[in-house]
Amino acid sequence: MPIRQLPEILINQIAAGEVVERPASVVKELVENAIDAGATRVDIELEAAGVRLIRIRDNGHGMAAQELPLAVLRHATSKIASLDDLEAVATLGFRGEALPSIASVSRFTLMSRRATDEHGAVLQIEGGTLGEVIPHAHAPGTTVEVRELFYNVPARRKFLRAERTELGHIEEWARSLALAHPDLELRLSHNGKLSRRYKPGDWYSDARLIEILGEDFAHQALRVDHSGAGLRLHGCIVQPHYSRLNADQQYLYVNGRPVRDRSVAHAVKQAYSDVLYQGRHPAYVLFLELDPARVDVNVHPAKHEVRFRDARLIHDFVYRTVQGTLAQTRAGTPPLAVGVGDVEGEGEGARPPGRHAVSFSGRRGGASHVLGSYSTSTAPLMQGVPSVSVADAPAAYAALYAAPPTQVMDAVPQMQTGLPLAAGAGDVPPLGYAIAQLHGIYILAECADGLIVVDMHAAHERIGYERLKRAHDGIGLRTQPLLVPMTLMVAEREADVAECEAETLASLGFEVTRSGPGSLQVRSIPALLSQAEPEMLLRDVLSDLSEHGHTRRVAEARDTLLATMACHGAVRAHRRLSISEMNALLRDMEATERSGQCNHGRPTWARFSLAEIDRWFLRGR
């Protein structure tokens, strides 16, 4: 077959295959155009989940009558005019591909009017054939009608799912849009009935989060807001015990654009690795803001993906911010708002004095509701209440490098006996005062508003683990030279990474030199991990550096070893504790980072409110 120029209609239909995957894709493109046009209200009307009809009305700036034919030409746009504009683009759309692609696979009508015009205009297109622009009564703004989607591409229509499934994709996209644009009023109707309505309002308000993501998410949300290095990350992450079986509540926005990015998702999951139960996924809504010139949004036909100019910096920034937020949670205390000054130094947009975190007034009972309401507390923890001192010196952990793990169990702090805490001495601490031990496994404590139940082994395990990590961090990373250098055969690409990242590997305890196109010579390894298959560990490190530009393999291997040591050193089930020992454990929990979960991600405690206990016995009815 000879080479030939494809007709314009076929070119647009090919482009539609990339841009228009399903009705939700059409809704996305058209509503993003409305937002770029300054709309504050968008109405979405659907029939048969968008297959029969999609109608988008907005109150944006509108278009002049003579611009309507231009709007449906490929690569005609008002948003960029040069390469410099493309590199700094801040609008959601910019290519000028969506309208001609949609019009080529549907019966398409475009109506618009500017506020300064006496009347609007309408343009109809069927199968890529343009009609004439004629005057038409229309309010200021734009209306787009898409009828019989894929009517002329029956093969594509056969691949559409059931009506309920296609509608679900549109509703999920509308939810994502409402999160990104709290100032936008969005109405979604299906088959003549109002399905969703998102009113404009404060993004962090109790009602809006509950409306979009549900009560459980809102009640477990931790505020994130951190700036530095020209970056800002803000939004909400949830407590680890609100993890999900699927990654279905993970929303990431880069400069207001909803995207999927493996590097950022990897950074968030690593930040949760110490507190997340195996096989579970964190939930979050995160907004990353940076100079548009530092991110390339023109890498995916549907603009679902972006490429960062400094992916390693972004990964590290997200990881440290999320990890710092999680680290500030203490058992029994309401979660705090994390601002710029809370995570590794001061940044550009520090939280002003007196600014508090969002307060969620709703409360839920039950063992699953571990942290009660969400609010800011600025009072020092446990003022005037004696606590168990931590006298563990870093020198006590030097044996970690000289002895096998079985000889260093004493490094894990043992349960200490403190003076009984009188219930009348000062304010009641967050986890209250111990009153009994249940079956040698659980501690029962009376708190200000109910009953606290603590898994004593899991709680002590976390306390010991965090102390071991702090002690090890005080010592620093030590290396162990090998008597005989180890030769490691790798792919040439991995050898290139090892050569380029020699300083990074050295900071992790590996002294590695390249000895051939596909071979490395390893002269030293991390001392603490000398028995942890260093060859496999190094391969994993190189894989991470190649894929993400960042690695925590050594830290994770170290933490796994320390977690095992803490587990073996923790108080065992069925050991009877005195009241003072139980109170000592409760005070340590309140002072320990991430003490709401054990080293394996299981919860360490639960609260039952007095109101809930009253309901058990039908009191007050």
Curated annotation (Swiss-Prot):
It comes from the Bacteria. The keyword DNA damage applies. GO terms for cellular component: mismatch repair complex. It holds the Pfam family HATPase_c_3. GO terms for molecular function: ATP binding; ATP hydrolysis activity; ATP-dependent DNA damage sensor activity; mismatched DNA binding. PROSITE patterns: DNA_MISMATCH_REPAIR_1 (PS00058). CDD domains: HATPase_MutL-MLH-PMS-like, MutL_Trans_MutL. SUPFAM superfamilies: ATPase domain of HSP90 chaperone/DNA topoisomerase II/histidine kinase (SSF55874), DNA mismatch repair protein MutL (SSF118116), Ribosomal protein S5 domain 2-like (SSF54211). Transmembrane segments: none annotated. Keywords: DNA damage, DNA repair. GO terms for biological process: mismatch repair. Belongs to the DNA mismatch repair MutL/HexB family. This protein is involved in the repair of mismatches in DNA. It is required for dam-dependent methyl-directed DNA mismatch repair. May act as a 'molecular matchmaker', a protein that promotes the formation of a stable complex between two or more DNA-binding proteins in an ATP-dependent manner without itself being part of a final effector complex. This is DNA mismatch repair protein MutL. The gene is mutL.
